[in-house]
Amino acid sequence: MKEKDFQQQVISIARMYGWKVQHSRAVQMANGRWATPIQGEAGFPDLVLVKSNHDGRGGVIFAELKTDLGRVQDHQKAWICALHAGGAECYVWRPTDLLNISHRLSALSSHVAVTQ
């Protein structure tokens, strides 16, 4: 499965459960290079998911998406480590994790261990 197809599945699941989704899309520059025109350090996770309920509970998840064979780059690992150190919930999700992803996104308070 291509990463963009997997990403669409994750976004659909997140929206089904009421999560707000942020994804910065890469664009092709005039010189043919691909870039994401935002400022910041390279390697920021692909998705930021945010949810709050009427009872005041909420959650924020940072998710780096990879194909089943995709490799997490060093600059991506650095972001994941920094986010974890700051107390954030952060995952590397792969297509084989879809059931666990769905379970995690269906609940606010439970943290489901997912492949890294």
Segments from the language model and where they lie:
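Catalytic phosphate/metal-binding cores of nucleic-acid and nucleotide-processing enzymes, i.e., regions
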Residues: 1-116
